[in-house]
Structure formats: structure tokens, C-alpha cells
Amino acid sequence: MAHAEGFLNLVKDAKKRIKELSVQDVKKRIDAGDKIILVDTREDVEWARGHAAGAIHLGKGVIERDIENVIPDKEATVVLYCGGGFRSALAADNVQRMGYHNVISMDGGWKGWTEAGLPTIKD
């Protein structure tokens, strides 16, 4: 299904304020030993079908409510991903507004991660 114009405009606006990295750049940082908290912002059903190895789950619907309890360190490097990079961009914008300083949205999201053959797990 094609994304609605209003949604795409919200994402475009959010992307002006956030940092994005490609799937490959995120993997390079992980391989280099950078301390990264990888957060899957997809819906529960999407998470259950499989997710990036090492990721934690804070769905887009609850991330703003729960992130401070799950990741209290607002200086932590937090990489958010969703299906393709749109919802995670919106979430990254909100999380930054909450005072987190090192928030990154992974461009390409789950689709890019799996297409690159990177490690996944299924709960």
C-alpha cells in the first residue's frame, strides 16, 4: 500500500531534524564495538515475525511513554528502526524532543536489514 501524502510530509519534516544512518553504516558501528542500543519501533506482530539480533522492542505506539524507563541514559546512542525508515524517523524526532541527544533513525529499516542478510532472530 502506498503511503499517504500527509504521512510522507510528516516524515519529510521530521527528517530535517534527525540523524539517519544506512543499514550498512549501523552494522559498521556495531562491528566496530560502538555501544549502540538498537530499538525496533514496529508493531508487536511485526516484531514477533522476526527482528534484528540484539534489538529491543519499543513500538511506535509506546516509545514516548516507555523509553525513559527502558533507556534512562539520555546520552546513550539509540538507533531506531521500523519497516523501512519512516516510522522510526517520526519516533526519533519525538525522542530527541524528549531530551535524548544521540538518536539515529536507520534508513531502510527492517527491509534493508534483511535484504543485507544481517542477523535476525524470532521470538
What are these regions (language model features)?
Residues 1-36, 41-77, 83-123:
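Rhodanese-like catalytic fold shared by cysteine-dependent sulfurtransferases
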